[in-house]
């Protein structure tokens, strides 16, 4: 199945728009795992098993693995998700952006080494920096558009022909870049007005929406701004609020409870 097909099936099967971000910070791991070999994989595996029936996707953030020399554990994790929970897509959050020849190797990293179903990329260097990822049939390419961090406004609100840059990116994705239906866009929950504008521009294109949970994005405003006519169209990401709900032995159950509550809150407004 393609990334888009997997995502659509997961929306329906798990009745969920929730994406759980896998950002394993060694300083916040459960006390019982601190300093143990393979702790990053073990922690993420427990989170995955506790939440897989509640989510539409998992999103490992590559920097949390690379900074700990845990690339092998990231490979192991993606393989585990595919084997133990088939049908739940894995988005590699890498935010890559480089010239085409270098992007070819980043695409190999994402799709051949890590075997992710989708990857996040930056559009700043133009279409030729993204085309190597699109050369992989069925893989998702999720483009930064209006990010959740406050500093995103420094660039994303610069005016281009009377429009903010993030709108120009959304229009380019819709009109020129998404020829094979592989693209999605990143739009932060911290900016619901911009979510609504991007949805208006791109139609039913999937939106990856970080910023609820620890970043404080409003779930009701996010869902109402970003949902498609059938109540889907979004991967609403929560990382820290779920991952670090507890540092005790009950951490996986605590994570499940927060994920369940988050899914239920999303669905309250999704179907309302």
Curated annotation (Swiss-Prot):
Active-site residues, Swiss-Prot/TrEMBL: 95
InterPro entries assigned to the protein according to its UniProt record, in alphabetical order: Aldolase_TIM (IPR013785), OMPdecase_AS (IPR018089), OMPdecase_type-2 (IPR011995), OMPdeCOase_dom (IPR001754), RibuloseP-bd_barrel (IPR011060)
UniProtKB keywords: Decarboxylase, Lyase, Pyrimidine biosynthesis
Enzyme Commission number(s) from the entry: 4.1.1.23
Biological processes, Gene Ontology terms: 'de novo' pyrimidine nucleobase biosynthetic process; 'de novo' UMP biosynthetic process
Catalytic activity annotation: orotidine 5'-phosphate + H(+) = UMP + CO2
Protein name: Orotidine 5'-phosphate decarboxylase
Organism: Cupriavidus metallidurans (strain ATCC 43123 / DSM 2839 / NBRC 102507 / CH34)
Lineage, top ranks: Bacteria, Pseudomonadati, Pseudomonadota, Betaproteobacteria, Burkholderiales
